[in-house]
Amino acid sequence: MAKLSTEELLDAFKELTLLELSEFVKQFEETFGVTAAAPVAVAAAPAAGGAGGEAPAAEEQDEFDVILESVGDKKIQVIKEVRALTSLGLKEAKDLVDGAPKPVLEKVAKEAADKAKAALEGAGATVTVK
């Protein structure tokens, strides 16, 4: 049998119906002794067990929330930083700052979360990254 390229395999899969693809997956799992659901279960386990094992969850976490805990005495600077970090208007940014503790950014990369934390703390706010 000639070796098929990835593109040729994808083209062949595109021509199959969902029922045929489902049967293929079952046969593939039986032939190679693997399960298509295993990677999903492994990826979901750290998220579900995050409360129990804090250290392992922190190592594997790739999305972070930046939470404004308190404003401090430089409220205007904090509002300016919130507007710079988000696409919020003046009123929305002021409402967010007034309602602290509130999330400023959600599900961002570690680098973005650290930059946001540094910027907000530089403006006088107290911030946590979760």
From Swiss-Prot:
SUPFAM superfamilies, A to Z: ClpS-like (SSF54736), Ribosomal protein L7/12, oligomerisation (N-terminal) domain (SSF48300)
Record-linked CDD domains: Ribosomal_L7_L12
Domain of life: Bacteria
One Pfam family, short name: Ribosomal_L12
Keywords from the UniProt entry: Ribonucleoprotein, Ribosomal protein
GO BP annotations listed: translation
InterPro entries named among the record's database cross-references: Ribosomal_bL12 (IPR000206), Ribosomal_bL12_C (IPR013823), Ribosomal_bL12_C/ClpS-like (IPR014719), Ribosomal_bL12_oligo (IPR008932), Ribosomal_bL12_oligo_N_sf (IPR036235)
Gene3D superfamilies the UniProt entry points to: 3.30.1390.10, Single helix bin
GO cellular component, as recorded: cytosolic large ribosomal subunit
GO molecular function: mRNA binding; structural constituent of ribosome
Family, as annotated: Belongs to the bacterial ribosomal protein bL12 family.
Alphabetical list of PANTHER family matching this protein: 39S RIBOSOMAL PROTEIN L12 (PTHR45987), LARGE RIBOSOMAL SUBUNIT PROTEIN BL12M (PTHR45987:SF4)
Function field: Forms part of the ribosomal stalk which helps the ribosome interact with GTP-bound translation factors. Is thus essential for accurate translation.
Assembly and oligomerization: Homodimer. Part of the ribosomal stalk of the 50S ribosomal subunit. Forms a multimeric L10(L12)X complex, where L10 forms an elongated spine to which 2 to 4 L12 dimers bind in a sequential fashion. Binds GTP-bound translation factors.
Protein name (record): Large ribosomal subunit protein bL12
Gene that encodes the chain: rplL
